[in-house]
Every structure is written in structure tokens, then in C-alpha cells.
Design a protein with these regions (language model features):
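Glycine-rich, positively charged N-terminal anion/phosphate-binding segment
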Residues: 2-5, 10, 19-91
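Short glycine- and Lys/Arg-enriched binding-loop motifs that mark or flank ligand-binding interfaces
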Residues: 72, 98, 110
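Conserved Rossmann-like nucleotide-binding pocket used by diverse enzymes
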Residues: 15
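Glycine-rich, proline-tolerant flexible connector loops at the mouths of alpha/beta enzymes
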Residues: 44-51, 101-122
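Alpha-helix-loop-beta-strand connector modules within alpha/beta enzyme cores
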Residues: 61-69, 116-136
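General secondary-structure edge motif
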Residues: 10-11, 69, 104, 111
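Short glycine/proline-enriched coil/turn segments at helix->beta-strand junctions
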Residues: 36, 93, 133-136
Length: 136
């Protein structure tokens, strides 16, 4: 006999991790009806690209009709850039904002963020603190 225990009743969350070029709004729209309580993630968004976002850019991050838990993942190596990106996206209703500190993606290749942050805990902490302070 098979026993099914809902993850939520165990205090467990099911996350769909960020996948570059995949976890965009279209995939999230497909996944949400399949598992409404799943915590979905955006692709890694470069903080520098969110310095002066247009309304169209912001809508692509979280369309007005998108519901359910959603995490915005930011990639960046500068505290000022990350803080600015957090402020720019503050009104979009993300449940969490995550600092990418482990991505091996070629998108971060040679950059001072992503997996390279694993080598410098003090710097990673200062970036996370800048993001938290910007969020208020």
C-alpha cells in the first residue's frame, strides 16, 4: 500500500531551482498549475541589468498575473549594484531575493560573482548585507 504525505504538512518546500534559459515566465506558467505550492525561481538576473529597468523588463520578471511563491535570484559582484537591483524590484512581490553565490554558469564566467563568491566569504557576506539593508 502506498502512502502519500503532502510535503507541506511536513514543513518541506519543493523548489524548482534557477536554470539559465529555462526558468523564465513561460516555464513557470507551465509548472504552476502542476504544483501550485512549489517555490519557483527566476533565472539569474544580472544586477547591472536592473539598474534602470523599464516597466517591460520588470513585467518579464514577474508578470502581473503570476501567482504563487517566487524567488528572484540576483547575480552581481558590487554591493551598490545589488542594492539598487533590490530597490528596483521591491514592489514586484517576490517572496525572496537570493544572491547567486554558487552558479557555475558561463554567464558568470570571469565575473566576480556566482561560484567565485564561494572563495570569499567576507565579500559574500557584505554583498548579502547590502541587499538586506536595501530591502529594509
Amino acid at each position: 500500500m502506498a502512502v502519500s504525505i503532502p510535503l507541506a504538512s511536513c514543513g518541506v518546500q519543493f523548489h524548482v531551482a534557477p536554470l539559465q534559459c529555462y526558468t523564465n515566465q513561460h516555464l513557470r506558467a507551465l509548472l504552476r498549475p502542476l504544483c501550485p505550492s512549489a517555490v519557483l525561481w527566476t533565472e539569474m538576473e544580472k544586477a547591472e541589468g536592473l539598474q534602470r529597468p523599464s516597466a517591460v523588463d520588470l513585467r518579464s520578471l514577474r508578470p502581473d498575473d503570476e501567482r504563487g511563491p517566487l524567488v528572484l535570484q540576483l547575480g552581481g559582484g558590487g554591493a551598490t549594484q545589488l542594492a539598487s537591483a533590490v530597490r528596483a524590484t521591491a514592489g514586484l512581490g517576490f517572496d525572496e531575493i537570493n544572491l547567486n553565490a554558487g552558479c557555475p554558469s558561463v554567464e558568470t564566467g570571469g565575473a566576480s560573482y556566482g561560484a567565485s563568491l564561494m572563495l570569499d566569504g567576507h565579500r559574500t557576506r557584505s554583498l548579502a548585507e547590502a541587499m538586506a539593508e536595501a530591502h529594509g
